[in-house]
Amino acid sequence: MSGLGFTGVVRIAVMALLALAFLGAPAHATSRIKDLANIEGVRQNQLIGYGLVVGLNGTGDTLNNIPFTKQSLQAMLERMGVNIRGATIRTGNVAAVMVTGNLPAFATQGTRMDVTVSAMGDARSLQGGTLLVTPLLGADGNVYAVAQGSLAIGGFSAEGAAASVTKGVPTNGRIANGAIVEREIEFALNRMPNVRLALRNGDFTTAKRIAAAVNDFLGTKTAEPIDPSTVQLSIPAEFRGNVVALLTEIEQLQVEPDITAKIIIDERSGIIVMGRDVRVATVAVAQGNLTVSISESPQVSQPNPLSNGRTVMTPRTDVGVTENGNKLALVKNGVSLQELVDGLNGLGIGPRDLIGILQAIKAAGAIEADIEVM
Protein backbone atom coordinates (compact mmCIF):
# COMPACT_ATOMS: atom_id res chain seq x y z
CA MET A 1 0.00 0.00 0.00
CA SER A 2 1.34 3.42 -0.88
CA GLY A 3 2.53 5.51 2.07
CA LEU A 4 0.68 8.75 2.77
CA GLY A 5 2.09 11.78 4.57
CA PHE A 6 0.22 14.03 6.97
CA THR A 7 -1.04 16.23 4.12
CA GLY A 8 -2.37 13.20 2.26
CA VAL A 9 -4.15 11.91 5.37
CA VAL A 10 -5.79 15.29 5.96
CA ARG A 11 -6.92 15.47 2.33
CA ILE A 12 -8.43 11.99 2.45
CA ALA A 13 -10.17 12.81 5.74
CA VAL A 14 -11.74 15.91 4.19
CA MET A 15 -12.82 13.87 1.16
CA ALA A 16 -14.39 11.28 3.46
CA LEU A 17 -16.38 13.95 5.32
CA LEU A 18 -17.62 15.36 2.02
CA ALA A 19 -18.58 11.88 0.85
CA LEU A 20 -20.55 11.27 4.05
CA ALA A 21 -22.31 14.59 3.59
CA PHE A 22 -23.36 13.60 0.08
CA LEU A 23 -24.43 10.13 1.20
CA GLY A 24 -26.61 11.70 3.87
CA ALA A 25 -28.44 13.80 1.28
CA PRO A 26 -31.76 12.67 -0.20
CA ALA A 27 -31.39 9.85 -2.70
CA HIS A 28 -33.51 11.60 -5.32
CA ALA A 29 -32.63 15.29 -5.20
CA THR A 30 -34.27 17.69 -7.62
CA SER A 31 -32.72 20.65 -9.40
CA ARG A 32 -34.03 23.74 -11.09
CA ILE A 33 -34.22 23.68 -14.86
CA LYS A 34 -32.07 26.81 -14.65
CA ASP A 35 -29.26 24.67 -13.22
CA LEU A 36 -29.68 21.87 -15.76
CA ALA A 37 -30.00 23.71 -19.07
CA ASN A 38 -29.13 26.92 -20.91
CA ILE A 39 -31.24 28.92 -23.34
CA GLU A 40 -29.82 28.13 -26.76
CA GLY A 41 -28.15 31.23 -28.19
CA VAL A 42 -27.81 32.97 -24.82
CA ARG A 43 -24.08 32.73 -24.28
CA GLN A 44 -20.85 34.65 -23.99
CA ASN A 45 -18.74 35.55 -27.01
CA GLN A 46 -14.95 35.49 -26.93
CA LEU A 47 -13.00 38.60 -27.86
CA ILE A 48 -9.31 39.09 -28.57
CA GLY A 49 -6.99 42.01 -29.23
CA TYR A 50 -3.32 42.96 -29.57
CA GLY A 51 -1.87 45.83 -27.57
CA LEU A 52 1.02 47.33 -25.66
CA VAL A 53 1.69 47.51 -21.94
CA VAL A 54 3.85 50.43 -20.79
CA GLY A 55 5.26 51.59 -17.47
CA LEU A 56 7.23 48.43 -16.72
CA ASN A 57 10.28 48.77 -14.50
CA GLY A 58 12.79 47.49 -17.04
CA THR A 59 11.06 44.10 -17.25
CA GLY A 60 9.53 44.56 -20.70
CA ASP A 61 10.44 43.13 -24.09
CA THR A 62 13.95 43.36 -25.48
CA LEU A 63 13.25 45.41 -28.59
CA ASN A 64 16.26 44.04 -30.49
CA ASN A 65 14.97 40.49 -29.97
CA ILE A 66 11.22 41.11 -30.39
CA PRO A 67 10.70 42.99 -33.68
CA PHE A 68 6.89 43.16 -33.49
CA THR A 69 7.08 45.08 -30.20
CA LYS A 70 9.41 47.63 -31.77
CA GLN A 71 7.22 47.98 -34.86
CA SER A 72 4.07 48.39 -32.75
CA LEU A 73 5.73 51.04 -30.59
CA GLN A 74 6.88 52.97 -33.67
CA ALA A 75 3.42 52.78 -35.27
CA MET A 76 1.72 53.98 -32.07
CA LEU A 77 4.08 56.94 -31.66
CA GLU A 78 3.65 57.92 -35.32
CA ARG A 79 -0.14 57.97 -34.89
CA MET A 80 0.46 60.43 -32.06
CA GLY A 81 2.69 62.62 -34.24
CA VAL A 82 6.08 61.38 -33.02
CA ASN A 83 8.43 60.27 -35.82
CA ILE A 84 11.16 57.91 -34.63
CA ARG A 85 11.95 56.14 -37.90
CA GLY A 86 15.65 55.35 -38.01
CA ALA A 87 16.13 56.23 -34.34
CA THR A 88 17.55 53.75 -31.85
CA ILE A 89 15.04 52.71 -29.19
CA ARG A 90 16.51 51.18 -26.04
CA THR A 91 13.58 51.20 -23.66
CA GLY A 92 12.78 48.10 -21.64
CA ASN A 93 9.50 49.40 -20.24
CA VAL A 94 7.20 48.20 -23.05
CA ALA A 95 5.75 44.75 -23.73
CA ALA A 96 3.56 43.39 -26.52
CA VAL A 97 0.53 41.55 -25.15
CA MET A 98 -2.58 39.67 -26.19
CA VAL A 99 -5.80 40.80 -24.53
CA THR A 100 -8.73 38.39 -24.17
CA GLY A 101 -12.18 38.64 -22.65
CA ASN A 102 -15.72 37.27 -22.77
CA LEU A 103 -18.53 39.50 -24.00
CA PRO A 104 -21.55 38.75 -21.76
CA ALA A 105 -24.88 37.83 -23.29
CA PHE A 106 -27.18 40.84 -23.83
CA ALA A 107 -24.34 43.26 -22.98
CA THR A 108 -25.29 46.82 -23.93
CA GLN A 109 -23.10 49.73 -24.96
CA GLY A 110 -21.19 51.07 -21.99
CA THR A 111 -21.22 47.77 -20.09
CA ARG A 112 -17.85 46.98 -18.52
CA MET A 113 -16.15 43.57 -18.63
CA ASP A 114 -12.97 41.99 -17.27
CA VAL A 115 -10.02 41.25 -19.53
CA THR A 116 -6.92 39.07 -19.27
CA VAL A 117 -3.55 40.37 -20.48
CA SER A 118 -0.75 37.96 -21.47
CA ALA A 119 2.80 38.78 -22.61
CA MET A 120 3.86 37.68 -26.10
CA GLY A 121 7.58 38.48 -26.13
CA ASP A 122 10.41 37.97 -23.65
CA ALA A 123 9.08 40.32 -20.97
CA ARG A 124 10.01 39.07 -17.49
CA SER A 125 7.09 40.69 -15.69
CA LEU A 126 4.05 42.88 -16.33
CA GLN A 127 4.05 44.13 -12.73
CA GLY A 128 3.10 47.81 -12.53
CA GLY A 129 2.20 48.04 -16.21
CA THR A 130 -0.66 49.89 -17.89
CA LEU A 131 -2.44 48.59 -20.97
CA LEU A 132 -2.92 51.21 -23.67
CA VAL A 133 -6.17 51.46 -25.65
CA THR A 134 -6.71 48.07 -27.29
CA PRO A 135 -9.64 47.21 -29.60
CA LEU A 136 -11.15 43.78 -28.89
CA LEU A 137 -12.43 41.89 -31.92
CA GLY A 138 -14.91 39.05 -32.27
CA ALA A 139 -14.63 36.03 -34.57
CA ASP A 140 -16.28 38.08 -37.34
CA GLY A 141 -13.52 40.72 -37.21
CA ASN A 142 -15.70 43.50 -35.79
CA VAL A 143 -14.67 45.56 -32.77
CA TYR A 144 -17.03 44.89 -29.84
CA ALA A 145 -15.11 46.42 -26.94
CA VAL A 146 -12.10 48.59 -26.10
CA ALA A 147 -9.75 47.79 -23.20
CA GLN A 148 -7.39 49.98 -21.19
CA GLY A 149 -6.17 50.19 -17.61
CA SER A 150 -3.66 49.16 -14.94
CA LEU A 151 -2.85 45.48 -14.57
CA ALA A 152 -3.24 43.37 -11.44
CA ILE A 153 -0.63 40.60 -11.39
CA GLY A 154 -0.99 37.42 -9.35
CA GLY A 155 2.75 36.65 -9.24
CA PHE A 156 6.04 38.48 -8.95
CA SER A 157 9.61 38.24 -10.15
CA ALA A 158 12.75 39.65 -8.54
CA GLU A 159 16.40 39.16 -9.35
CA GLY A 160 19.86 40.24 -8.29
CA ALA A 161 23.36 39.83 -9.63
CA ALA A 162 23.62 36.16 -8.71
CA ALA A 163 20.11 34.96 -7.90
CA SER A 164 16.48 35.40 -8.89
CA VAL A 165 13.07 34.36 -7.57
CA THR A 166 9.73 34.00 -9.34
CA LYS A 167 6.35 33.23 -7.81
CA GLY A 168 3.23 32.60 -9.83
CA VAL A 169 3.07 33.86 -13.42
CA PRO A 170 4.17 37.51 -13.54
CA THR A 171 3.68 37.67 -17.32
CA ASN A 172 -0.09 37.30 -17.04
CA GLY A 173 -2.55 39.68 -15.40
CA ARG A 174 -6.12 40.93 -15.31
CA ILE A 175 -7.89 44.27 -15.48
CA ALA A 176 -11.17 44.23 -13.58
CA ASN A 177 -13.83 46.11 -15.58
CA GLY A 178 -11.01 47.02 -17.93
CA ALA A 179 -13.02 46.98 -21.17
CA ILE A 180 -16.06 48.95 -22.30
CA VAL A 181 -18.57 47.37 -24.70
CA GLU A 182 -18.93 49.45 -27.87
CA ARG A 183 -21.10 47.18 -30.03
CA GLU A 184 -24.12 45.10 -29.04
CA ILE A 185 -24.97 41.66 -30.41
CA GLU A 186 -28.53 41.62 -31.67
CA PHE A 187 -30.61 38.81 -30.18
CA ALA A 188 -34.38 39.40 -30.27
CA LEU A 189 -35.38 36.86 -27.63
CA ASN A 190 -38.86 38.31 -27.06
CA ARG A 191 -39.75 37.94 -30.75
CA MET A 192 -38.76 34.27 -31.08
CA PRO A 193 -41.63 31.81 -31.78
CA ASN A 194 -39.59 28.87 -30.46
CA VAL A 195 -36.93 28.53 -27.79
CA ARG A 196 -34.56 25.63 -27.26
CA LEU A 197 -33.24 24.49 -23.89
CA ALA A 198 -29.71 23.05 -24.20
CA LEU A 199 -28.93 20.55 -21.44
CA ARG A 200 -25.50 20.91 -19.86
CA ASN A 201 -25.26 17.12 -19.51
CA GLY A 202 -27.20 15.42 -22.27
CA ASP A 203 -29.48 12.58 -21.16
CA PHE A 204 -32.66 11.14 -22.70
CA THR A 205 -34.41 10.70 -19.37
CA THR A 206 -33.57 14.17 -18.10
CA ALA A 207 -34.70 15.78 -21.37
CA LYS A 208 -38.02 13.94 -21.18
CA ARG A 209 -38.53 14.98 -17.55
CA ILE A 210 -37.83 18.63 -18.36
CA ALA A 211 -40.37 18.57 -21.19
CA ALA A 212 -42.94 16.92 -18.91
CA ALA A 213 -42.39 19.50 -16.16
CA VAL A 214 -42.86 22.39 -18.61
CA ASN A 215 -46.00 20.84 -20.11
CA ASP A 216 -47.50 20.22 -16.67
CA PHE A 217 -46.82 23.83 -15.70
CA LEU A 218 -48.36 25.32 -18.86
CA GLY A 219 -51.17 22.79 -19.15
CA THR A 220 -50.46 22.25 -22.85
CA LYS A 221 -47.98 20.20 -24.83
CA THR A 222 -45.61 23.00 -25.78
CA ALA A 223 -42.28 21.35 -24.88
CA GLU A 224 -40.80 18.39 -26.73
CA PRO A 225 -37.41 16.65 -26.35
CA ILE A 226 -35.58 16.73 -29.69
CA ASP A 227 -32.50 14.78 -28.60
CA PRO A 228 -30.68 14.02 -25.32
CA SER A 229 -29.30 17.56 -25.18
CA THR A 230 -32.20 19.64 -26.54
CA VAL A 231 -35.77 20.41 -25.50
CA GLN A 232 -37.75 22.60 -27.91
CA LEU A 233 -40.34 24.96 -26.46
CA SER A 234 -43.08 26.48 -28.63
CA ILE A 235 -44.04 29.84 -27.16
CA PRO A 236 -47.78 29.90 -26.25
CA ALA A 237 -49.87 32.71 -27.73
CA GLU A 238 -50.31 34.44 -24.36
CA PHE A 239 -46.52 34.80 -24.00
CA ARG A 240 -45.76 36.02 -27.53
CA GLY A 241 -43.71 39.19 -27.21
CA ASN A 242 -43.02 38.40 -23.55
CA VAL A 243 -40.77 35.35 -23.76
CA VAL A 244 -38.61 36.55 -20.87
CA ALA A 245 -41.55 36.27 -18.44
CA LEU A 246 -42.20 32.69 -19.57
CA LEU A 247 -38.57 31.63 -19.26
CA THR A 248 -38.39 33.18 -15.79
CA GLU A 249 -41.15 30.83 -14.65
CA ILE A 250 -39.76 27.78 -16.46
CA GLU A 251 -36.27 28.23 -14.98
CA GLN A 252 -37.63 27.72 -11.46
CA LEU A 253 -39.37 24.39 -12.18
CA GLN A 254 -37.93 21.44 -10.26
CA VAL A 255 -36.76 18.32 -12.14
CA GLU A 256 -35.00 15.19 -10.94
CA PRO A 257 -32.02 14.72 -13.29
CA ASP A 258 -30.89 11.25 -14.32
CA ILE A 259 -27.18 10.63 -14.65
CA THR A 260 -25.06 7.87 -16.13
CA ALA A 261 -23.29 5.67 -13.61
CA LYS A 262 -19.70 6.85 -13.81
CA ILE A 263 -16.46 6.65 -11.85
CA ILE A 264 -13.91 9.44 -12.30
CA ILE A 265 -10.30 8.62 -11.41
CA ASP A 266 -7.40 11.08 -11.15
CA GLU A 267 -4.32 8.88 -10.98
CA ARG A 268 -1.97 11.78 -10.27
CA SER A 269 -3.66 12.82 -7.03
CA GLY A 270 -5.36 9.54 -6.11
CA ILE A 271 -8.82 11.15 -6.09
CA ILE A 272 -11.80 8.94 -6.93
CA VAL A 273 -15.36 10.21 -7.46
CA MET A 274 -18.24 7.74 -7.85
CA GLY A 275 -21.87 8.51 -8.67
CA ARG A 276 -24.71 7.19 -6.54
CA ASP A 277 -25.95 4.86 -9.34
CA VAL A 278 -22.78 2.77 -9.47
CA ARG A 279 -23.61 -0.93 -8.97
CA VAL A 280 -21.33 -3.96 -8.70
CA ALA A 281 -22.07 -7.61 -9.52
CA THR A 282 -20.86 -10.47 -7.34
CA VAL A 283 -17.06 -10.44 -7.27
CA ALA A 284 -14.27 -11.53 -4.91
CA VAL A 285 -11.51 -9.00 -4.23
CA ALA A 286 -8.10 -9.88 -2.81
CA GLN A 287 -5.54 -7.25 -1.92
CA GLY A 288 -2.02 -7.66 -0.58
CA ASN A 289 1.16 -5.64 -0.46
CA LEU A 290 4.49 -6.96 -1.62
CA THR A 291 7.48 -5.02 -0.30
CA VAL A 292 10.98 -5.57 -1.68
CA SER A 293 13.82 -3.95 0.29
CA ILE A 294 17.39 -3.76 -0.97
CA SER A 295 20.24 -2.45 1.17
CA GLU A 296 23.85 -1.95 0.16
CA SER A 297 26.62 -2.13 2.83
CA PRO A 298 30.05 -2.27 1.14
CA GLN A 299 32.83 -3.92 3.17
CA VAL A 300 36.50 -2.91 3.26
CA SER A 301 39.05 -5.71 2.73
CA GLN A 302 42.42 -4.90 4.28
CA PRO A 303 45.56 -6.82 3.21
CA ASN A 304 47.94 -8.33 5.78
CA PRO A 305 50.69 -6.04 7.06
CA LEU A 306 53.94 -6.03 5.05
CA SER A 307 52.19 -7.82 2.20
CA ASN A 308 51.93 -6.60 -1.37
CA GLY A 309 48.13 -6.61 -1.27
CA ARG A 310 45.84 -3.61 -1.80
CA THR A 311 42.86 -2.34 0.13
CA VAL A 312 39.69 -3.09 -1.84
CA MET A 313 35.95 -2.55 -1.41
CA THR A 314 33.76 -5.65 -1.55
CA PRO A 315 30.05 -5.25 -2.23
CA ARG A 316 27.44 -6.63 0.16
CA THR A 317 23.79 -6.61 -0.78
CA ASP A 318 20.88 -7.66 1.44
CA VAL A 319 17.55 -8.34 -0.27
CA GLY A 320 14.37 -8.85 1.73
CA VAL A 321 10.82 -9.59 0.57
CA THR A 322 7.80 -9.16 2.83
CA GLU A 323 4.13 -9.61 1.98
CA ASN A 324 1.34 -8.48 4.28
CA GLY A 325 -2.28 -7.50 4.28
CA ASN A 326 -3.45 -10.50 2.24
CA LYS A 327 -7.23 -10.48 2.53
CA LEU A 328 -10.11 -11.72 0.43
CA ALA A 329 -13.51 -10.05 0.45
CA LEU A 330 -16.72 -11.02 -1.34
CA VAL A 331 -18.72 -8.16 -2.84
CA LYS A 332 -22.30 -9.31 -3.38
CA ASN A 333 -24.41 -8.67 -6.46
CA GLY A 334 -26.02 -5.23 -6.83
CA VAL A 335 -24.39 -3.55 -3.85
CA SER A 336 -24.68 0.22 -3.55
CA LEU A 337 -21.88 2.76 -3.57
CA GLN A 338 -21.77 2.99 0.22
CA GLU A 339 -21.64 -0.80 0.60
CA LEU A 340 -18.85 -1.02 -1.97
CA VAL A 341 -16.78 1.64 -0.21
CA ASP A 342 -17.38 0.06 3.21
CA GLY A 343 -16.34 -3.35 1.91
CA LEU A 344 -13.12 -2.11 0.32
CA ASN A 345 -12.29 -0.03 3.38
CA GLY A 346 -12.62 -3.23 5.39
CA LEU A 347 -9.62 -4.55 3.48
CA GLY A 348 -7.58 -1.53 4.56
CA ILE A 349 -7.37 -0.29 1.00
CA GLY A 350 -6.16 3.25 0.36
CA PRO A 351 -7.23 5.53 -2.50
CA ARG A 352 -4.35 4.64 -4.81
CA ASP A 353 -4.87 0.89 -4.35
CA LEU A 354 -8.59 1.41 -4.88
CA ILE A 355 -7.90 2.78 -8.36
CA GLY A 356 -6.34 -0.48 -9.51
CA ILE A 357 -9.08 -2.56 -7.87
CA LEU A 358 -11.88 -0.61 -9.59
CA GLN A 359 -10.18 -0.97 -12.96
CA ALA A 360 -9.77 -4.71 -12.37
CA ILE A 361 -13.44 -5.09 -11.38
CA LYS A 362 -14.44 -3.22 -14.54
CA ALA A 363 -12.20 -5.50 -16.64
CA ALA A 364 -13.93 -8.51 -15.06
CA GLY A 365 -17.28 -7.14 -16.22
CA ALA A 366 -18.61 -6.88 -12.67
CA ILE A 367 -19.01 -3.12 -12.39
CA GLU A 368 -21.99 -1.35 -13.97
CA ALA A 369 -20.45 2.05 -14.62
CA ASP A 370 -18.17 3.90 -17.00
CA ILE A 371 -14.66 4.54 -15.69
CA GLU A 372 -13.03 7.77 -16.84
CA VAL A 373 -9.34 8.27 -16.06
CA MET A 374 -8.15 11.87 -16.00
UniProtKB/Swiss-Prot annotation:
Assembles around the rod to form the L-ring and probably protects the motor/basal body from shearing forces during rotation. It holds the Pfam family FlgI. It comes from Nitrobacter winogradskyi (strain ATCC 25391 / DSM 10237 / CIP 104748 / NCIMB 11846 / Nb-255). NCBIfam families: PRK05303.1. It is found in: Periplasm; Bacterial flagellum basal body. The lineage of its organism: Bacteria, Pseudomonadati, Pseudomonadota, Alphaproteobacteria, Hyphomicrobiales. The basal body constitutes a major portion of the flagellar organelle and consists of four rings (L,P,S, and M) mounted on a central rod. One of its GO terms (cellular component) is bacterial-type flagellum basal body, distal rod, P ring. Residues 1-29 form the signal peptide. GO terms for molecular function: structural molecule activity. Residues 296-311 have a biased composition (Polar residues). GO terms for biological process: bacterial-type flagellum-dependent cell motility. This is Flagellar P-ring protein. Keywords: Bacterial flagellum, Periplasm, Signal. Belongs to the FlgI family. The gene is flgI. Residues 296-316 are annotated as: Disordered.
